[in-house]
Amino acid sequence: MARYLGPKLKLSRREGTDLFLKSGVRAIDSKCKLETAPGQHGARKTRLSEYGVQLREKQKVRRTYGVLEKQFRNYYKDAARTKGNTGENLLTLLETRLDNVVYRMGFGATRAEARQLVSHKSIMVNGSVVNIPSFKVSANDVISIREKSKKQARIIAALEVSSQREKPTWVEVDNTKMEGAFKRLPERSDLSAEINEQLIVELYSK
């Protein structure tokens, strides 16, 4: 399955919420009718079935983190095999992806941009270059920008934008050094309350 390369705002309208696929510190509500689905008949109100609600939630989370369907299903399988709450385990696995951590630290303006930085070998983990976006980051790992990449305009711009918003409590970032520490795994209370991971569990449990 190919990665989606179309308009980012259309995905947010499809899910009815800001998926933070565009850069910037403000939400996109002012320029994007999130309450209206894309397409000619987007204004029509359709009542979703139970399955439809579960599917929409899965698509929302999958698109937020920029993960393909097969990858997402594999994350769910891993989460189900892990001790604890399956839904929370799933979110933790998604949060520990290297591209997501790079985004959370503010080195990339969006997760898509963070993914590019990783793929283009601009990111180091504990002093070694890692170019796999799905690389699993562990507690106390140090993420840094490769020396030759520190002058990239997009990284500097992303750091300027991220300095205007509060960073997650589970990461610690030194903008001057362009490096940060992944202090701990995020707890469920740290993450968005708009995500209903139980719907995803119900979907895959069928």
Curated annotation (Swiss-Prot):
Gene Ontology biological-process annotations: ribosomal small subunit biogenesis; translation
Coiled coil: none
Entry's Gene Ontology molecular function annotations: rRNA binding; structural constituent of ribosome
Keyword rRNA-binding: yes
Cellular component terms (Gene Ontology): small ribosomal subunit
Function: One of the primary rRNA binding proteins, it binds directly to 16S rRNA where it nucleates assembly of the body of the 30S subunit. With S5 and S12 plays an important role in translational accuracy.
Protein name: Small ribosomal subunit protein uS4
Biological source species: Shewanella woodyi (strain ATCC 51908 / MS32)
